[in-house]
Curated annotation (Swiss-Prot):
Its EC number is 2.4.1.256. This is Dol-P-Glc:Glc(2)Man(9)GlcNAc(2)-PP-Dol alpha-1,2-glucosyltransferase. GO terms for biological process: dolichol-linked oligosaccharide biosynthetic process; protein N-linked glycosylation. Its main location: endoplasmic reticulum. It catalyses: an alpha-D-Glc-(1->3)-alpha-D-Glc-(1->3)-alpha-D-Man-(1->2)-alpha-D-Man-(1->2)-alpha-D-Man-(1->3)-[alpha-D-Man-(1->2)-alpha-D-Man-(1->3)-[alpha-D-Man-(1->2)-alpha-D-Man-(1->6)]-alpha-D-Man-(1->6)]-beta-D-Man-(1->4)-beta-D-GlcNAc-(1->4)-alpha-D-GlcNAc-diphospho-di-trans,poly-cis-dolichol + a di-trans,poly-cis-dolichyl beta-D-glucosyl phosphate = a alpha-D-Glc-(1->2)-alpha-D-Glc-(1->3)-alpha-D-Glc-(1->3)-alpha-D-Man-(1->2)-alpha-D-Man-(1->2)-alpha-D-Man-(1->3)-[alpha-D-Man-(1->2)-alpha-D-Man-(1->3)-[alpha-D-Man-(1->2)-alpha-D-Man-(1->6)]-alpha-D-Man-(1->6)]-beta-D-Man-(1->4)-beta-D-GlcNAc-(1->4)-alpha-D-GlcNAc-diphospho-di-trans,poly-cis-dolichol + a di-trans,poly-cis-dolichyl phosphate + H(+). Dol-P-Glc:Glc(2)Man(9)GlcNAc(2)-PP-Dol alpha-1,2-glucosyltransferase that operates in the biosynthetic pathway of dolichol-linked oligosaccharides, the glycan precursors employed in protein asparagine (N)-glycosylation. The assembly of dolichol-linked oligosaccharides begins on the cytosolic side of the endoplasmic reticulum membrane and finishes in its lumen. The sequential addition of sugars to dolichol pyrophosphate produces dolichol-linked oligosaccharides containing fourteen sugars, including two GlcNAcs, nine mannoses and three glucoses.
Length: 473
């Protein structure tokens, strides 16, 4: 880290942590009792804090593994010995929530290290761009909000980013172990451990593909036609996978992830599924429109990079040149929206989430809207893919497979499910110009201000309950 860049980084981290501490104080004053999912997480963590680890003490409404509680106890328990605090203080709601604030500091540092690793250091990428990119992602609204509640998001992000960083540095055993830690926070994080393995495979495939293209006499026969490149890559993959040398090399590199995969399969067999506890509200289904919702979500939060007159012009030009393909894609998308759109009971009933109002006032009110939005979905998907064109075709393939696997089976539309894939995506696009980063950061700041203000000040009550309710992501 260059000296000047070190100053930028330290200033950004210090200011972010200071603001976070002030917000944490405001949250602590406003929320004296557990809120939303905290009514399950906090009592369970407190039981662990008291030393009650038996299964009979487990809340069956909790559907994730106890990673958050175990790490929390490991962090706050030493305070009893170091500071002489009582167990009541150490296991309080405020202390447990503070663990996520510590995770947010770790996430800030990991994001910076990942930007330095993923984005090569060159004259085109200045130190201010890396620090601004880090700051922007650290205050990404849907992630930043949950730093102040006792949810699994911050810890899940920490271990997944750490696993990705270790993978990029070639420490695959450490990466797989951290992937297991991430899995202990949220079971679907196993997909991002697979992504780390896929990253290794994509790197080796890219190297072999470049070698193939550089040969004077291509071993593959010339192919002509509209899908020539696709068929050529498919032929290459088939030839590559037939080589024992190639497969053994990949096996030696990825065996820690393969072992983790076997452990996950064993867990699923023994548990009878991926979800623990109450499964009635977490049934898997083929919810293909989740991809479209993610594309829209990404377009909204990355609009300085994905939405511009030149982008729209390029897209329209491409549509005209390949209008038959566009027509087919549109037809398939409309069919997927028609046959595979689901509305989870929580989405329809819980008016504390923003998704409730998006669904009720847009999709539920106007039946045709979900079809009229298909061209916008296609543009968003194309713009996302276009922004990743600096990555290899094999990396893109691995990323979109993992994206599909992690969000399509989810019946419930909830923005929290989009956080990790969004951050992975945002890390891997080329560093934008400083002006766009400032625009993005400013928009995030405005969104954060609005959501925090609404959450803390615009409360309401249900007719059948005296509890204070709040609007949130």
């Amino acid at each position: 880290m260059a000296q000047l860049e070190g100053y930028y980084f330290s200033a950004a981290l210090s200011c972010t942590f200071l603001v976070s501490c002030l917000l944490f104080s405001a949250f602590s004053r406003a929320l004296r009792e557990p809120y939303m999912d905290e009514i399950f997480h906090l009592p369970q963590a407190q039981r662990y804090c008291e030393g009650h680890f038996s299964l009979s003490q487990w809340d069956p409404m909790i559907t994730t593994l106890p990673g958050l509680y175990l790490v929390s106890i490991g962090v706050i328990k030493p305070a009893i010995w170091i500071f002489g605090w009582s167990e009541h203080v150490v296991c309080s709601i405020g202390m447990l929530r503070f663990v996520n604030l510590l995770f947010s500091v770790g996430n800030f540092y990991l994001l910076y290290l990942l930007f330095c690793k993923v984005q090569p250091r060159n004259k085109a990428a200045s130190s201010i761009q890396r620090v601004l990119s880090t700051l922007t992602l650290a205050v990404f609204p849907t992630l930043y909000f949950f730093n102040f509640l006792y949810y699994t998001e911050a810890g899940s992000m920490f271990f997944t980013l750490f696993a990705y960083l270790m993978c990029l540095y070639g420490n695959h055993k450490t990466s797989a172990f951290l992937g297991f830690c991430g899995f202990m926070f949220r079971q679907t994080n196993i997909i991002w451990a697979v992504f780390c393995a896929g990253n290794v495979i994509a790197q080796k495939l890219t190297e072999a593909w470049k070698t193939e293209l550089q040969k004077k006499e291509d071993r593959l026969p010339p192919i002509k036609g509209p899908f020539a490149e696709f068929r050529k890559i498919l032929q290459f993959l088939l030839a590559y996978s037939m080589s024992f040398k190639n497969l053994s090399m990949l096996l030696l590199l990825t065996w820690p992830y393969i072992l983790l995969g076997f452990l996950f399969c064993a867990f699923v067999v023994v548990n009878g599924g991926i979800v623990i506890g109450d499964r009635s509200s977490h049934e898997a289904c083929l919810h293909f429109p989740q991809l479209f919702y993610f594309f829209s979500f990404t377009l909204f939060f990355s609009f300085p990079h994905l939405l511009s007159p030149s982008k729209i012009k390029t897209f329209l030009s491409l549509v005209w040149k390949r209008r038959i393909l566009f027509f087919v894609v549109t037809l398939v998308s409309v069919f997927l929206v028609w046959k595979f759109t689901y509305a989870h009971k929580y989405l329809l009933a819980d008016n504390r989430h923003y998704t409730f109002y998006v669904w009720k006032r847009v999709f539920q009110r106007y039946e045709t809207v979900k079809y009229l939005l298909v061209p916008a979905y296609i543009f968003a998907g194309w713009s996302i893919a276009d922004s990743l064109k600096s990555k290899s075709i094999f990396w893109n393939l691995m990323f979109f497979i993992c994206l599909f696997t992690v969000i399509v089976p989810q019946k419930l539309l909830e923005f929290r499910y989009f956080i990790l894939p969004y951050v992975i995506y945002r890390l891997n696009i080329p560093l934008p110009p400083t002006s766009r980063l400032i625009c993005e950061l400013s928009c995030y700041a405005v969104v954060n201000f609005i959501t925090f203000f609404i959450f803390l000040n615009k409360t309401f009550q249900w007719p059948n309950s005296q509890d204070i309710q709040r609007f949130m992501w």
